[in-house]
Amino acid sequence: MKQVNVKKLILPNIPYVFIALLATKVSEAVRLAPGSDVSTKLLNIMTGLNTAFHSLVPSFHPIDLCVGVAAAIAIRLAVYIKGKNAKKFRKNLEYGSARWGTAEDIKPYVDPAFENNIILTQTERLTMNSRPKDPKTARNKNVLIVGGSGSGKTRFWLKPNLLQCTSKTYPTSFVVTDPKGDIVVSCGHALQKNGYQIKILKSLNFKKSMHYNPFAYIHSEKDILKLVTTLIANTKGEGKAGDDFWVKAETLLYTALIGYIHYEAPVEEQNFSTLIEFINAMEVREDDEDFKNPVDLMFDELKKRKPDHFAVRQYAKFKLSAGKTAKSILISCGARLAPFDIQELRELTAYDELQLDTLGDRKTALFIIMSDTDDTFNFLISMCYTQLFNLLCEKADDVYGGRLPVHVRCLIDEAANIGQIPRLEKLVATIRSREISCCLVLQAQSQLKALYKDSADTIVGNMDCSIFLGGKEPGTLKELAAALGKETIDSYNTGESRGREVSHSLNYQKLGKELMSVDELAVLDGGKCILQLRGVRPFLSNKYDLTKHPLYRYTADYDKKYAFDIERFLSHRLKLKPDDAVEVYQADLSGEPVA
């Protein structure tokens, strides 16, 4: 049964009680006025009023009470009818209330200390504090940056935010996608100067990269499944998707082999090279179903020792396929893993130096350098990001009680070119609470839709901040114009009629106009950008001037002597520092012959 809100029922009607009491006094005045008819009483009404109001006590005469109640009901009914039929006017907002944001609008979201903010534009910033005193001003740190080629995505946004590395209140690690390899050259020195550990993964030249082994981050059966899912999602090519059967069959085989490698192989053999060797050794004879290749024998031996082993169960499902089918599956696997036949790539993934699970422990800057023209090896970068998100979320939950001590910002330039990150739409919705943020840099929003299909809108919806730096892609311009809304403007028209007599007319009216139309967005000034922050009016502001940043003087853009030398860094990276922690092993060589 619905409860009656007594307070809401009584309080609005209290004024009418006083009206009723006042009406009883007026009725009493008329009743006490001298005279026998109405006209005489009205002439002597003042005498009646003086007599009635001589005492402020309401009249309880039956006639007066009836008049008071009737008056209160009549006025209450009139107010009710008036309210129902009232016209709703919004002066100067008739066709829309859109406007540009001001300094007062952004003020609640900015930290007083410059270094504790994310740089959005020249005049707008967003605090790194994910739990501000006023909860209604809390915003996630996910940012969507859209700008055509040459709009300054790197210079006006990415580099300034990378230089926000001096905060002691909110320490931050960075994961930066560096398509041309010039961001680390420009900003690497400034980061090192502020205590950052630099790490580099390079898919352009494997010899000039630190080693990355996805197998090093497998700790459980679910990690194996995650790795296989990522591998398949990012090596499927651009053609029409094949039969789902073959993908599932490949998944079974990869899961079985990687499970065997993880649980049974020595640590130094837990890599893609071993996986390739396994597949190469899996000979299948269509005319001999009972033939056993070396891998079959290895799994038979493992089954005898551990019949319930995870890898054994997966391999048994794969072996249900007939000889011809199994051969087709192996061919498909060989084609998918063809890049790992390159010796340099096998060397790159032989062991791990990136230590992705430590980015939330101490200030680190991981630069992922990739080609902006060739995406052959971009699947490796996507695997890196997928494992990074999973590892950091698990560590935040299992070790740090839900929040990493060092916030990890992923600045993903050319986000559409690194390949698909599985479940990104779910990750961007959940990583905020773990002190992780994801910033996607695109040339057009259509790139995101092409890669993530229906999930693209979910990803954009979980970006509390979006910045448009300029561009001409029609879909992006149309969506932005609609999001900015309409403002109400004044229109002044003049008319002139000519005939026997000349007449003139003037007409003033209100009209609705888009805050910025599609054609206006297409010719947006190169120094301007549009910022949208959830719950705040949009801002039309200047792009951030990199030369105004306090750390600009330590970048290669300011002076070439501060250029970060990648080759020199990689050649000296194994030199130990006094505070480095290392594992020491003691070996007994007493039985060895003396050289």
Region annotations inferred by a language model:
Residues 1-151, 155-163, 168-170, 486, ...:
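Basic- and hydrophobic-enriched, low-structure N-terminal and domain-boundary segments
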Residues 22-28, 126, 133-436, 451, ...:
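P-loop NTPase motor domains
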Residues 428-530:
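Conserved ATP-driven motor cores of ASCE-family P-loop NTPases powering translocation/secretion/packaging/pilus
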